[in-house]
A protein has these predicted regions:
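Rossmann-fold cofactor-recognition segment
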Residues: 59-73
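Conserved glycine-rich cofactor-binding loop
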Residues: 24-25
Length: 260
């Protein structure tokens, strides 16, 4: 019983209706290409219509729906369009995100609000938008892209890590409420992935992987029906072990490892 998949495994993508929000670059673009190659019916959303259009060759049948995840009315309008076009949505992936490496003394109101709006409030509003139709059908899946930065406090992740920690909590609570109603909930917690966002980092990123590798890990986790899909394991397992340390030891170790 303990080994039973927590979610319904997704193994056959042919004709599966997937709305990917945050599809223009990095993990989102790589996942869009991987899903298109497996026959999924795609709707791709991001703020940049130009970057979405650049995916047209890899995803020629995809519906392109430019939007800003922080604008609830835009998400709702796109959702209504998809319901009218498809009749339902099988999986919504909330991948839109923003990141600024900040120390505590660099905090400002604009950075706080932007990060929370994109990384947390936008996905929460998005779930509130898509959920009623899924509940009416008694089927569907929601995937939220978090981060291992949400496991515990880390230097330079004061806003980003906080938003991802809250998103992980949100995903866990969603699962408890929705699994009995036939809705699958996945939380995807990557380590370091080579993307335009992580290109801002001026420090060595352990176990750095490509966006294509990340997309493959996500598909493998969905196929296993895992609640939490975390990768690369050689890094994320270490981060999970650090969750068990008492704070005195954790703080000391992180200072030594980061040199901060």
């Amino acid at each position: 019983m303990l080994l039973r998949a927590l979610n319904t495994p997704i193994t056959d993508w042919q004709g599966r209706r997937v709305w990917l929000i945050g599809a223009s670059t990095g993990i989102g673009a790589a996942l869009a290409c991987a899903l298109a190659s497996r026959g999924a019916k795609l709707a791709l959303s991001a703020r940049s219509s130009d970057k979405l259009a650049a995916l047209a060759d890899a995803c020629p049948e995809a519906l392109l729906l430019p939007l800003d995840i922080t604008r609830r009315e835009a998400v709702a309008a796109a959702h209504e369009r998809l319901l009218a076009h498809w009749g339902g949505i099988d999986l919504v992936v909330f991948n839109a995100g923003t990141y600024r490496p900040l120390r505590a003394w660099e905090l400002d109101a604009a950075a706080i609000r932007e990060t929370l709006a994109v990384n947390l409030i936008g996905p929460m509003d998005g779930v509130a938008t898509v959920l009623p139709a899924m509940l009416e059908r008694g089927a569907g899946a929601i995937a939220l892209v978090g981060s291992v930065a949400g496991y515990r406090g880390l230097p330079r992740a004061i806003t980003y890590g906080s938003s991802k920690a809250a998103l992980i909590h949100f995903a866990e609570t969603l699962y408890l409420d929705l699994a009995p109603r036939g809705i699958s909930v996945f939380v995807i917690n990557p380590g370091f992935v080579a993307t335009p966002l992580t290109a801002q980092n001026d420090f060595r990123m352990p176990a750095l992987i490509s966006a294509d590798t990340a997309a493959g890990e996500i598909l493998a986790g969905l196929a296993r029906g895992e609640f939490e899909i975390h990768f690369p394991k050689r890094f994320t397992r270490v981060m999970k072990a650090l969750q068990c340390l008492p704070r005195r030891l954790y703080f000391s170790l992180i200072r030594k490892l980061t040199g901060l």
